[in-house]
From Swiss-Prot:
GO cellular component, one term: Golgi membrane
Source lineage: Eukaryota, Metazoa, Chordata, Craniata, Vertebrata
Transmembrane region(s): 17-37
Main EC class the enzyme belongs to: transferase
Species this chain originates from: Danio rerio
Residues in the Lumenal compartment per record: 38-352
Similarity comment: Belongs to the sulfotransferase 2 family.
Catalytic activity field: chondroitin beta-D-glucuronate + n 3'-phosphoadenylyl sulfate = chondroitin 4'-sulfate + n adenosine 3',5'-bisphosphate + n H(+)
Protein name: Carbohydrate sulfotransferase 11
Length: 352
């Protein structure tokens, strides 16, 4: 009899735990179904709520209802970018919303700065190292006041920045609703070629050579040498392209973040981003964000080495080495990024 009562008590506790988990997930489901179909906001939606601390509230007000003349042109530009994202999501709802609901694990790319109530979705190969440096300075999660004093490897240490997936579901919902959210994007094929050059043509990236290079050589290179199979250090762009468009690649695991699509990393059809910056106008857009949060006088976004960056001409050279079929397949893979962020189809593509 006692054993039966104990068993019933255990079952009751388990049921309560399951119910609590389901309720939390249901709350997250509600938030995302509400946010997925909300109209594009043209005015600051938070001005009357008194929800935000000084930095973020002023940032949102200036973004949606600029009072300073220098912000007026930027406000029009960023409204057009928001509209482009929303229009693409509506027009391609079947493909852009394959995932109807997000979970906390989908939010690991969203970096949170509590002091300024900012959320930044980082996209590798779009100045994300410098943005992580800036976010470390803004959030005070480090000993530095100058972003360029932060070693690049330290900027990528997970514990140096807090990401949205570390919060409870109610706290996630609160921040997604009330914080200024932004991301930076880049011409998709320039970003792809930049990732290839960085991860497969530099000797020091042995971890990528071992994890991905050996797999690519084994699958797509005929008569590969023993050395190539063991090191994976000499992957050709054609082999990399073949790996990306192979249906089996995405079935086995999500793409690596360095060549994953922006819409899969940041979920712009599920999360309303207030500001979309572009790599092509990086310094202007980045410093605009810093001005919005009241840090424009004390902090400037680091400039980058233009001599080593991947250009359109460089991307054209790499794409000239792959077939028109592979070019078409790659375009289909990154098509939503092209459409959402208003990038033209590259003139060098030979689409079938």
């Amino acid at each position: 009899m006692k054993q039966t009562i104990l068993d019933l008590m255990r079952m009751s506790r388990i049921c309560r735990m399951v119910l609590a988990t389901c309720l939390g997930s249901f709350i997250l489901v509600i938030f995302y179904f509400q946010s997925m179909f909300q109209p594009v906001m043209r005015r600051n939606p938070f001005a009357a709520e008194g929800c935000c601390r000084k930095g973020s509230r002023n940032a949102l007000q200036e973004l949606y209802n600029p009072t300073q003349a220098e912000f007026s042109a930027a406000a029009v530009l960023h409204q057009a970018r928001r509209d482009q994202v929303a229009e693409t999501c509506r027009a391609h709802s079947a493909s852009s919303r394959k995932r109807r609901v997000l979970t906390p694990s989908d939010l690991k790319h969203l970096v949170v700065d509590e002091d300024h109530e900012l959320i930044y979705c980082y996209v590798p190969k779009v100045a994300c190292t410098n943005w992580k440096r800036v976010m470390m300075v803004l959030s005070g999660r480090g000993k530095y006041s100058n972003p360029m004093e932060i070693p690049s490897n330290e900027a990528h240490v997970p514990s140096n920045l807090k990401t949205l997936n570390q919060y409870s579901i109610p706290d996630i919902n609160h921040r997604l609703k009330n914080y200024l959210k932004f991301l930076f994007v880049r011409e998709p094929f320039e970003r792809l070629v930049s990732a290839y050059r960085n991860k497969f043509t530099l000797r020091y990236n042995t971890s990528f050579h071992k994890r991905y290079g050996t797999k690519i050589v084994r699958r797509y290179r005929k008569n590969a040498t023993t050395e190539a199979l063991q090191s994976g250090a000499d992957v050709k762009f054609q082999e990399f392209a073949e790996y990306l468009v192979d249906p089996g690649t995405q079935r086995e695991a999500p793409l690596n973040e360095h060549w994953q699509t922006v819409y899969s990393l940041c979920h712009p059809c599920h999360i309303h981003y207030d500001l979309v910056g572009k790599y092509e106008t990086l310094e202007d857009d980045a410093n605009y964000v810093l001005k919005l949060v009241g840090e424009g006088d004390s902090l400037r976004f680091p400039s980058f080495a233009k001599s080593t960056r991947t250009t359109d001409q460089m991307a054209a050279m790499f794409f000239g080495n792959i077939s028109s079929q592979q070019q078409s397949q790659l375009y289909q893979l990154y098509k939503l990024d092209y459409l959402m962020f208003n990038y033209s189809i590259p003139s060098y593509l030979k689409l079938q």
